[in-house]
Amino acid sequence: MNPNFLDFEQPIADLQAKIEELRLVGNDNSLNIGDEISRLQDKSKTLTESIFGNLTSWQIARMARHPRRPYTLDYIENIFTEFDELHGDRHFSDDAAIVGGIARLDNQPVMIIGHQKGREVREKVRRNFGMPRPEGYRKACRLMEMAERFKMPILTFIDTPGAYPGIDAEERNQSEAIAWNLRVMARLKTPIIATVIGEGGSGGALAIGVCDQLNMLQYSTYAVISPEGCASILWKTAEKAPDAAEAMGITADRLKGLGIVDKVIAEPLGGAHRDPVAAAALIREELSSQLAMLKAFDNDALLARRYDRLMSYGL
């Protein structure tokens, strides 16, 4: 099984393997097999459109966790210029599961904050698999208050299974760190745009998710608990995760229908990992447009709009 493809994508993987084999044959024997390659490429595109046009909620949850999916630093590289990363919470340490710093978007200074997972084993461990400890959220809070002080918009990228539940995190008051961020973000006198780029897991996501505009990528998720966690509570087995995912309404389209999400950003065919540069361009377009819209509000109007937005949840 090709690790770059999930199990429901294997028919696509098989076609891609055939295309690569034909390319190698053509290179070795100088044969003109372009027509056959074009036919298989068209077939692969049609098959991909068919599969991705009918994804279940559980399949979308798995897409949100795809090991090749672009992470925050990938989007920073492809969307912004002059990124200068800032470190530390000034209380305990620097948490690598949260990255943040100042950059430019359309030549405007902005503060970027996001979860960061890892690719290889060592980086995954260093980033704690994208699960922040309290010092990560306190670093984020420090950067957000800095952004308000220097009148910079805040752009957050959400991609976490959740806040780290370890004993050391609890000893340093994980719940307080999350709650404090919610309080601070609700009152910040600067525009905040949050974009869910992968997993939006519970309070770990919400701690950098209070905003004026919430975006979700097409194959991202946002929920109070993982489907496996929900299934383990309700049915006492994680095998019911597909049923839980469907019942919870974790997908971008479902949340858009509920009024939680403002904008669903389309992904390239097959997911953002198939064309990270194109995915970044789509996000950049939305961020530029939304920033221009939010800059039209003065501070009082911006805070009133944010408050009304939060109070509308669940109505």
Curated annotation (Swiss-Prot):
The primary location reported for this protein is cytoplasm
The highest taxon in the source lineage is Bacteria
Entry-linked PROSITE patterns = COA_CT_CTER (PS50989)
Q: Which reaction does it catalyse?
A: N(6)-carboxybiotinyl-L-lysyl-[protein] + acetyl-CoA = N(6)-biotinyl-L-lysyl-[protein] + malonyl-CoA
Biological or metabolic pathway of the protein: Lipid metabolism; malonyl-CoA biosynthesis; malonyl-CoA from acetyl-CoA: step 1/1
Q: Where in the cell is it found?
A: Cytoplasm
Q: What is the similarity comment for this entry?
A: Belongs to the AccA family.
- PANTHER family in the cross-refs: ACETYL-COENZYME A CARBOXYLASE CARBOXYL TRANSFERASE SUBUNIT ALPHA, ACETYL-COENZYME A CARBOXYLASE CARBOXYL TRANSFERASE SUBUNIT ALPHA, CHLOROPLASTIC
**Cross-referenced NCBIfam families, in alphabetical order?**
accA (TIGR00513), AccA_sub (NF041504), PRK05724.1 (NF004344)
Q: Under what name is this protein listed?
A: Acetyl-coenzyme A carboxylase carboxyl transferase subunit alpha
What is the organism of origin for this protein?
Answer: Pseudomonas syringae pv. tomato (strain ATCC BAA-871 / DC3000)
